[in-house]
Amino acid sequence: MSDIWHVLSVILVVLIPMALMVLGAARWAGYLRGPASLSPSHRRMLEKYALPYQRTASKDRPRFEHIVAQFIADKEWQGAGIGVAEEMKVLVAATAAQLLFGFDDVRLDHFERIILHPDSYRSGRKGTLHQGEVRPTAGVIMVSWGDLLRGYGNPRDGHNVGLHELAHALWFEHKLSEDKAPFLHPELLQRWIDHADGEIERIRNGRSRLFREYAGTNQAEFFAVAVEYFFERPGEFNAELPELYTVLCGMLNQFPDKASLS
C-alpha cells in the first residue's frame, strides 16, 4: 500500500505543476486573443461625436463599445492625402457597430483595410467621382471623410455614406462566407430579394414611394440605400414598405423604429 501511495504522490507532484503551467498558458493565450477593450479616450469620443452611440440604450452601450473596440483593432487604417485621427477611426467604427449590432460575431473579416479620403475623390479608369467604395477582392473599404461628416450632419435625410459602404461590405461578406458560415438567414434573404426586385422595378419606372433613384441600380445598391433609410428614416420606411422593412429587421436583428434611449 505504501508503494502505491508513493507512486501516486510522485504522479501528483509532477502533474499538478504541469497542469498549472498549461492552465496559466491557456489563460494568457486567451487574454491575448480576447476582445479589445475601449480606451477611456475612445469612449469620450463616442459620447461626443457618435450619434449612433448617443442613441443607444444605456444597457446596450457595453456591447456597442465592444464592437467599436474590436473593429478599430481588427482593421488597418490608412489615409489617402489625409492623416487618420483617432476620432475618424471611432466614428467609422461606430457606424459599423450600428450596422453589426444585431449579429453575434460578424466583423467583416474579409475587409482588412479602411482607407479614408479627405473628401469626394476620383477613381477608376473613367475618373468617376466617388464618396466611397468597397473592393471585395482587395479587402478594402474606402470612405470620404467629408461626406461621412455631412451624412451625420443631417441624420434624417436617408443619406449616410458610412452606412452605405458598410452595407455593401456586409452584403459581400455574406456572399464570400456563403459556403462556410453564412450569417444572413437564407429564407429572409430570398424574401428580401423577391420584394427588392419589385421595388427596384418601381424605382426605375419613377413610381417609388420612398427610395431615391440610385437604389434602382441593382440589388447591391438597393440593399445599401435601404440600410441608410432603415437607420435614418425607420418610421417612414415601415409606413411605406412594411413588408420590406420587416424582412430587413429580421435580417439585421434590429428594430430602429422602436429604439429607446432608456
Question: Residues of each region from the PLM?
Answer:
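N-terminal signal-anchor transmembrane alpha helix of single-pass membrane proteins
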Residues: 1-35
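Generic beta-strand structural signal
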Residues: 112-114, 139-141, 159
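Metalloprotease/metallohydrolase-associated module, dominated by Zn2+-dependent proteases
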Residues: 72, 89-104, 119-143, 147-153, ...
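Peri-catalytic and regulatory segments of divalent metal-dependent proteins
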Residues: 60-72, 76, 80-100, 104-110, ...
